[in-house]
């Protein structure tokens, strides 16, 4: 059975792709859930529109990611004040991706999603300067220097 996908399906394809599947899989799973439509001339035109929209969205997303990367690289060092032991310099708790996003926003940087921030380890648990990477788009990654200091 020849179908055109209207949504992303794992191990099969993305919206707008024309795929060949077994009849039962198409009739019992893809078509009832609205994940695909039967391939025809009109449906092929619709698939071309979906594909063009997806490509345009990818290009716009890449341009936006590059703008955010430029804004992040313009920041020298982002400073984050946290509760820490005066003797050992160890933190009471840890610095998470949410804390990093708030510090970047406070330093005048762009508003980011916490899921884009990749910490060197799961959490930062010591004072000092740490390099944090931000994944903005597939292929576009920015690096931010984060200086963790003790609150006074």
Swiss-Prot record:
Annotated PROSITE patterns: RIBOSOMAL_L9 (PS00651)
Keyword Cytoplasm: no
InterPro entries reported for this sequence: Ribosomal_bL9, Ribosomal_bL9/RNase_H1_N, Ribosomal_bL9_bac/chp, Ribosomal_bL9_C, Ribosomal_bL9_C_sf, Ribosomal_bL9_N, Ribosomal_bL9_N_sf
Alphabetical list of SUPFAM superfamilies matching this protein: L9 N-domain-like, Ribosomal protein L9 C-domain
Annotated Gene Ontology cellular component terms: ribonucleoprotein complex; ribosome
GO MF term set: rRNA binding; structural constituent of ribosome
Pfam families: Ribosomal_L9_C, Ribosomal_L9_N
Protein keywords: Ribonucleoprotein, Ribosomal protein, RNA-binding, rRNA-binding
A biological process from GO: translation
Family classification: Belongs to the bacterial ribosomal protein bL9 family.
Role: Binds to the 23S rRNA.
Protein name (database record): Large ribosomal subunit protein bL9
Species of origin: Mycobacterium sp. (strain KMS)
Organism lineage: Bacteria, Bacillati, Actinomycetota, Actinomycetes, Mycobacteriales
Gene: rplI
């Amino acid at each position: 059975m020849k179908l055109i996908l209207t949504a992303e399906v794992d191990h099969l394809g993305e919206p707008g792709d024309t795929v060949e599947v077994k009849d039962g899989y198409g009739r019992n799973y893809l078509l009832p859930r609205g994940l695909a439509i039967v391939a025809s001339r009109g449906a092929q035109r619709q698939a071309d529109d979906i594909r063009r929209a997806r490509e345009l969205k990818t290009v716009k997303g890449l341009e936006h990611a590059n703008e955010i990367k430029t804004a992040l690289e313009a920041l020298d060092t982002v400073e984050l004040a946290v509760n820490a032991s005066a003797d050992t310099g160890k933190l009471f708790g840890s610095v998470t991706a949410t804390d990093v996003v708030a510090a970047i926003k406070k330093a005048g940087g762009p508003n980011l999603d916490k899921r884009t921030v990749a910490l060197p380890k799961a959490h930062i648990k010591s004072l000092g300067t740490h390099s944090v990477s931000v994944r903005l788009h597939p292929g576009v990654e920015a690096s931010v220097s984060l200086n963790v200091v003790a609150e006074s």
